[in-house]
Amino acid sequence: MSWSLQPPSFLLCCLLLLFSPTGLAYVATRDNCCILDERFGSFCPTTCGIADFLSSYQTDVDNDLRTLEDILFRAENRTTEAKELIKAIQVYYNPDQPPKPGMIDSATQKSKKMVEEIVKYEALLLTHETSIRYLQEIYNSNNQKITNLKQKVAQLEAQCQEPCKDSVQIHDTTGKDCQEIANKGAKESGLYFIRPLKAKQQFLVYCEIDGSGNGWTVLQKRIDGSLDFKKNWIQYKEGFGHLSPTGTTEFWLGNEKIHLISMQSTIPYALRIQLKDWNGRTSTADYAMFRVGPESDKYRLTYAYFIGGDAGDAFDGYDFGDDPSDKFFTSHNGMQFSTWDNDNDKFEGNCAEQDGSGWWMNKCHAGHLNGVYHQGGTYSKSSTTNGFDDGIIWATWKSRWYSMKETTMKIIPFNRLSIGEGQQHHMGGSKQAGDV
């Protein structure tokens, strides 16, 4: 086919299609471009076929053009920014002027110092954060404690609104000693008031009453070492410690009270000493006609004889093997009472002061129930304050370096001792005051 054979109108249409804008200027359609000439209809695709082809791709071409225009716009902006940056560098940079000596090193050192300061402040910050958390925990704990205390105060205030009641049970029955109280029908051990014949007023004691009707008046008790027995003369005279309804506290009844009880009757008293070691084994020692003299005689201890008991007669002294006179100078019958501030012993020193107690000291002792409470029983010179056997000792039962766990001293009228307990009565050879 030759282009010279096409009609002018067809050529004009093709030129319009080729050179006209693809956007809004001209849109090719069958009506304005297609020439229905059978001579070319099936052989010349440059008429209606070209119009259909361009029409189908027109939208995509327009989108691509807009994308290219946007890319060109951004590139122009970046170019402008780069030019401005180059101008700024040219203003501050002088290629003809060399850098100052040490400028780079100085900047490096400043950078290092800044890093070190940052690290230091970060560590300090962490430390402060830890302290703040710790203080916050203390604050919260204290707040809880304050809340608990406020609750307890409120409870106490509520209790104080109620009438006061004595929670310690003191029995109503009274007598001159615990045996008289038992004779009046009392069957329960506990706290009772007694008034010995020469006493100006009644005082509280712990009575141990058994099923046979025996009423023991308790003079001393050691249980757990909770009470310090290093007291002065007045304290031993008046008594110290606490009396409990259950008999489970430590105390010394008082020398004046012991004197008033033991000297009041024509029927003499028997003294029983009860001991318990740290393995739970127990033993006793009984003494007949036990008495304690008045303060004017320094509360002198006397007894007639050792009745018996598997603990042995430590009050009669003990031969420790240190000196032939050990037994004589460690006996207790007829000895006056001594404390650290009132020395009445036979020793050139002060037995009560060196042993930290008050007792009927000789020079010094074989039986000592008011001594220092040594936990576990066994002790040594190195574990004591002055290097002496200052424990709760009973040398005829345990070594003088073995301290008892529990002790009790109690008295009862001599005629109330039970024959069935297996006590051995040694009526002969009784010791009187001053025999030692």
Curated annotation (Swiss-Prot):
UniProt KW Secreted keyword: yes
Cross-link (Isoglutamyl lysine isopeptide (Gln-Lys) (interchain with K-431)): Q423
Zinc recorded as keyword: no
Post-translational modifications reported in the UniProt record: Conversion of fibrinogen to fibrin is triggered by thrombin, which cleaves fibrinopeptides A and B from alpha and beta chains, and thus exposes the N-terminal polymerization sites responsible for the formation of the soft clot. The soft clot is converted into the hard clot by factor XIIIA which catalyzes the epsilon-(gamma-glutamyl)lysine cross-linking between gamma chains (stronger) and between alpha chains (weaker) of different monomers.
Keywords: Adaptive immunity, Blood coagulation, Calcium, Coiled coil, Disulfide bond, Glycoprotein, Hemostasis, Immunity, Innate immunity, Isopeptide bond, Metal-binding, Phosphoprotein, Secreted, Signal
Positions that bind Ca(2+): D343, D345, G349
Cellular compartment(s): Secreted
Xref: InterPro entries: FIB_ANG-like, Fibrinogen-like_C, Fibrinogen_a/b/g_C_1, Fibrinogen_a/b/g_C_dom, Fibrinogen_a/b/g_coil_dom, Fibrinogen_CS
Listed GO MF terms: metal ion binding; signaling receptor binding
GO biological process, alphabetically ordered: adaptive immune response; innate immune response; platelet activation; protein polymerization
Phosphoserine modifications at: S430
Function text: Together with fibrinogen alpha (FGA) and fibrinogen beta (FGB), polymerizes to form an insoluble fibrin matrix. Fibrin has a major function in hemostasis as one of the primary components of blood clots. In addition, functions during the early stages of wound repair to stabilize the lesion and guide cell migration during re-epithelialization. Was originally thought to be essential for platelet aggregation, based on in vitro studies using anticoagulated blood. However, subsequent studies have shown that it is not absolutely required for thrombus formation in vivo.
Domain notes: A long coiled coil structure formed by 3 polypeptide chains connects the central nodule to the C-terminal domains (distal nodules). The long C-terminal ends of the alpha chains fold back, contributing a fourth strand to the coiled coil structure.
Protein name: Fibrinogen gamma chain
Origin species: Mus musculus (Mouse)
Lineage: Eukaryota, Metazoa, Chordata, Craniata, Vertebrata
Record gene name: Fgg
